[in-house]
Every structure is written in structure tokens, then in C-alpha cells.
């Protein structure tokens, strides 16, 4: 049998989370920029109604499993009272310089049972020592250590490649810190990653999107691929990040018309989670420090629709082998199938066919697919059938099917299927 890449227990837990909420919040929230210069005065930061509880409450209500906060974006402004620089909440008027956005968000997530993770931009447009590689590596390692030791447990540490094209960092040092202080946290895309960037900011994964990879794109601004360190595991699943407002990661006033449509958000779910990836949907808090009602409402409507579609399977089976047949007590209308491999055994299926039993006892092919991995959601025109059959056409080893479920979403109580 071919030796297959296998996920760690931490990777499997992360993949089971499936849905994360990104919160881009910081200096840019008050300046109207996407990328700050690092010259904006700390006095600009003053979210007078800041409420991390509201963020976590929305995440919980919508059904997100984890929340990632931009602890430091490219402008270098830190949302925690770091000892490494004066360019932080400590120098802002907010809470008289005594506030800690990261700390309050971590506690709110814990209170609501939401996993917490941090984004820490390697590129720093404010820090004077950035041009000196050794000095900045030490500076960045200190910031990373503060976050890893002060705000855990963390489910993910997000390393953004934007602005770092061609720049070398001491990733071995940074990765060793994560492994030491937060061994179960996922490491995003850089150094020795345990998860990777899908390669776009549309929330849509290519298909097939295999869980094994040898590299990933650095950023949207170059086609160059990252050189990961040799210790990188072969199993590196993808995460799809996308803002709920078209091409706007940070909040700006009077841009509600940029909110993605409900139909687009549903399609993003099918193109991310439905292709075996995690979805990280950005809801940016506003200058008050609150997630706008319109943004929260759009996310909640999306997630409620998803739950309505998939909370009540017509039938579910599991097992192994090259063929599995699901039978119904009577002819049943079906338009969706969800497949999951037991990825503890690796990604074994390379191609498959789904068939429906016909009235004369024969079989009609509905579709063919390739990657299954953690999850594959297949949509098709509604059929009336007494049985569905999954046939494995190509595989690396005997498949272990964790879940084979059938659904009918073409119901009057659901939004029209897109």
C-alpha cells in the first residue's frame, strides 16, 4: 500500500471546526485604509463602545467555531499592551491606555465556547528595526511570545505573507515558539505550516483541493510560491478567507452596499466547506468597536440557511470498501449528498461516482467527483429514488467512509437552491 500523508490529531480537530470568523480591527478602522502606513498616531484608536462580548455572541449565534483577531496588522499597531513598542493600545486614549483588545476578545471567546486565534503580521511598516533582519526577528519573536503565553489556548496563529514577498524571516525560531507554547495551534501558511492559504480571497477553493501540498502562494500580489522548511508535514489542509463586504477587510462608513448577497455567501460555503476546506469569513468591527448589525445579520442568515439545509439528513451510513449502497424505505426525493472520509487514515479516494436506483432496478449515474477528504458536498437536480450508491473508481487504499448522507433541500421552507 502506498504510504499516505496523515493528519495530526490537532489538524483533525481543526478541520472538524470548519467555520471561523475573522475580525479585522485596528488602526485602519479609524483611518479608512486597508493597509496603514505605520505613521498614524496612536491617538486615532478609540473605540468608545468596544464590546468583545458582542463579537463572540454573534460568532456563537451564527455558528462559527473559532474567531481570529488581527492582533497586529501591517501598520504595526498592536491591540495588546505589548512591551516591545509604544505603538499600541497602551498609547491610545481608549480606556485611558489600560485596555487590551486581545485579552478581552480571548476572554469573550472562552465565555461563549468559541476557539480563539491571532493574526500577527510579519510585515511591520512602523517598527524602525524592520530593515535589520536579525533585530526584527528578535522583535517579532518577542511579540509572538507575548501572544502565545498571554492569551491561550489558541486554535490558530495566522501569518500573513502580504508585504513580505522576498523577505526572509527566522521561521525556524518562530515555529519553535508556537510548538513550545501552543503545540495544538494551527500555523498558517508560513515557515513550517500545518494549514495553508487557499490562494485567493474569494472564499472559493479550486476543485479538487487535496489536503497534501508542498507549497502555497505568498500573497495575492505575486505568483511566487513559498519555500516551506523541510520539517513541514505533507498534510497541510487549506483555509479559505473572504470578507463579507466586497474587497473590504476593514470597516469603512457608508459601505453597506458592499455586503455580499445571500446567494453569494451560500455559494462560498459550498465552494469552501463543501470542498473540504475551512471557511474564515471576515466580519469587521466598526469604529465604535461593534460588528455592524447588517454584517451580523447577513452572516446569521447565511448560517441559518446552511443549518436548515443540512441539519436533518434523509439517511446516513458509514463504512468501507469500494461500493456503498444507501436504501430508503420508499421512493425519496434527493438533491444533495455529503461525503466524508475518515481522514485519520489519510485521503484515500481519488475518484468516485454517485448513482441513483431507477424504477426498473437499474442504476443512473448522477455525478462523478475526485477529492473527498474531510468533506465533499455534491448538489444535483432532484431525483426520486429508493437507493443511492457510492462507487469508488480510483483509490490509493481501501476507503474509510466516515459519513455518507443524503438530503433534500428543494423544500418550500428553504431559500431557492443556487
Each model region followed by its residue ranges:
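Mature catalytic domains of secreted/periplasmic carbohydrate-active enzymes
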Residues: 1-382, 391-418
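Short, conserved beta-strand segments of beta-strand-rich sandwich/propeller modules, principally
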Residues: 387-389
Amino acid at each position: 500500500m502506498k504510504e499516505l500523508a496523515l493528519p495530526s490529531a490537532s489538524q483533525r480537530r481543526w478541520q472538524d471546526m470548519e467555520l471561523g470568523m475573522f475580525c479585522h480591527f485596528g488602526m485602519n478602522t479609524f483611518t479608512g485604509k486597508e493597509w496603514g502606513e505605520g505613521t498614524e498616531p496612536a491617538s486615532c484608536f478609540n473605540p468608545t463602545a468596544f464590546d468583545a462580548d458582542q463579537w463572540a455572541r454573534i460568532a456563537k449565534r451564527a455558528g462559527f467555531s473559532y474567531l481570529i483577531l488581527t492582533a497586529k496588522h501591517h501598520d504595526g499597531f498592536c491591540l495588546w499592551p505589548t512591551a516591545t513598542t509604544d505603538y499600541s493600545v497602551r498609547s491610545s486614549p481608549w480606556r485611558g491606555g489600560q485596555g487590551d483588545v486581545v485579552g478581552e476578545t480571548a476572554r469573550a471567546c472562552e465565555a461563549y465556547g468559541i476557539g480563539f486565534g491571532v493574526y500577527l503580521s510579519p510585515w511591520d511598516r512602523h517598527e524602525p528595526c524592520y530593515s535589520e533582519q536579525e533585530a526584527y526577528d528578535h522583535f517579532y519573536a518577542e511579540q509572538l511570545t507575548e501572544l502565545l503565553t498571554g492569551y491561550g489556548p489558541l486554535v490558530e496563529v495566522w501569518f500573513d505573507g502580504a508585504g513580505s514577498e522576498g523577505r526572509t524571516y527566522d521561521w525556524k525560531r518562530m515555529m519553535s515558539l508556537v510548538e513550545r507554547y501552543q503545540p495544538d495551534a494551527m500555523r498558517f501558511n508560513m515557515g513550517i505550516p500545518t494549514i495553508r492559504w487557499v490562494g485567493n480571497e474569494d472564499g472559493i477553493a479550486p476543485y479538487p483541493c487535496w489536503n497534501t501540498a508542498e507549497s502555497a502562494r505568498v500573497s495575492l500580489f505575486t505568483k511566487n510560491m513559498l519555500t516551506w522548511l523541510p520539517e513541514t508535514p505533507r498534510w497541510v489542509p487549506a483555509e479559505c478567507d473572504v470578507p463579507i463586504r466586497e474587497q473590504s477587510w476593514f470597516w469603512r462608513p457608508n459601505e453597506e452596499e458592499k455586503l455580499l448577497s445571500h446567494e453569494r455567501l451560500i455559494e462560498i460555503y459550498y465552494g469552501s466547506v463543501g470542498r473540504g476546506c475551512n471557511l474564515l469569513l471576515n466580519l469587521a468591527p466598526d469604529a465604535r468597536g461593534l460588528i455592524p448589525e447588517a454584517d451580523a445579520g447577513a452572516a446569521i442568515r447565511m448560517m441559518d440557511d446552511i443549518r436548515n439545509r443540512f441539519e436533518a439528513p434523509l439517511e446516513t451510513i458509514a463504512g468501507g470498501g469500494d461500493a456503498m449502497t444507501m436504501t430508503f424505505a420508499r421512493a425519496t426525493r434527493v438533491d444533495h449528498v455529503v461525503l466524508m472520509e475518515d481522514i485519520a487514515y489519510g485521503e484515500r479516494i481519488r475518484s468516485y461516482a454517485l448513482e441513483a436506483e431507477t424504477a426498473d432496478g437499474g442504476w443512473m449515474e448522477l455525478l462523478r467527483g475526485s477529492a473527498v477528504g474531510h468533506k465533499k458536498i455534491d448538489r444535483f437536480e432532484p431525483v426520486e429514488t429508493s437507493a443511492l450508491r457510492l462507487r469508488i473508481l480510483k483509490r490509493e487504499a481501501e476507503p474509510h467512509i466516515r459519513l455518507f448522507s443524503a438530503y433534500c433541500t428543494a423544500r418550500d421552507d428553504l431559500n431557492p437552491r443556487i
